[in-house]
Regions:
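A broad, structure-centric signal for solvent-exposed, well-ordered loop/edge residues
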Residues: 62, 160, 211-213
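Conserved ATP-driven motor cores of ASCE-family P-loop NTPases powering translocation/secretion/packaging/pilus
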Residues: 114-203
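Short, solvent-exposed amphipathic alpha-helical segments in soluble enzyme
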Residues: 68-71, 168-170, 210
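P-loop NTPase motor domains
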Residues: 1-122, 138, 185-197
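Active/binding-pocket-proximal capping segment
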Residues: 87-89, 95, 134, 144-147, ...
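Short alpha-helix boundary/capping motifs
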Residues: 98, 148-149, 208-209
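Charge-patterned, long linear interaction tracts outside catalytic cores
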Residues: 201-217
């Protein structure tokens, strides 16, 4: 990044003082990215196993910058990697992105996030958007629900009947809607209702993190 920044800063023909300059200055001041090219790897090389990008502690504008750059890099390298392998009706899963508190990013309307959601399957890339409320998926002009085929719904504190219609495609004020509404409100910890495509909802007992830990040890 230092090479890019220095070339940009020392080029008098490039107009300064705009939003791009402000973004580069912040990334440079906070030393977000590695400055030494020999110490860097491609994003896909780093994504081996579980990799957590912790953005807590940064201002929201810096978080948005990092997310936008990371998503753009991921998308370009995803396409360069080519289509994933097929085995019968099943496609190889190569990468899985989990976005926690996804409403913070969905509200930004990142174009690349939508591209990954829309095109990722061909490249074996799955995406999980985790958020507290169902309304976050369809607010404003950004309707993320059209890119989602699988829903895993836990207990929702401010659930509305319209949310049930939105996810489960039930008719408003129908008996099915009310049954699902009551079921979701009554879900206990580590229990969920799963909706896959056009299939009927399935009640699931989730495997808790401590159960996975016990199995591993």
């Amino acid at each position: 990044f230092d090479q890019v920044y220095n070339r940009y800063a020392n080029d008098d023909e490039i107009k300064k003082g705009d939003s791009l300059a402000a973004a580069l200055d912040k990334l440079h001041i906070f030393q977000i990215f590695e400055g030494n090219p020999s110490a860097t790897k491609s994003l896909f090389e780093i994504l081996n196993g579980v990799v957590v990008i912790d953005l807590s502690g940064y201002d929201s504008d810096i978080q948005s910058l990092i997310v936008a750059i990371t998503l753009d890099l991921f998308y370009s390298q995803m396409q360069a990697s080519g289509s994933s392998k097929m085995e019968g009706n099943y496609r190889q899963l190569t990468k899985l992105i989990l976005v926690d508190e996804a409403d913070n990013f969905m509200s930004e309307g990142f174009p690349t996030l939508k591209k990954i959601l829309k095109e990722g399957r061909e490249f074996g890339v799955g995406t999980i958007l985790s958020t507290q409320f169902l309304k976050h998926f369809g607010s404003g002009d950004d309707d993320y629900s059209k890119y989602i085929l699988t829903w895993v719904v836990h207990n929702v504190s401010d659930l509305k009947n319209s949310d049930v219609d939105f996810v489960f495609k039930t008719e408003a004020k129908s008996q099915e809607n009310q049954v699902l509404f009551n079921a979701i409100k009554g879900l206990t910890k580590h229990h969920s209702i799963v909706k896959i495509g056009n299939n009927k909802p399935v009640y699931v007992q989730d495997k808790a993190f401590w159960e996975l830990y016990q199995e591993a040890h």
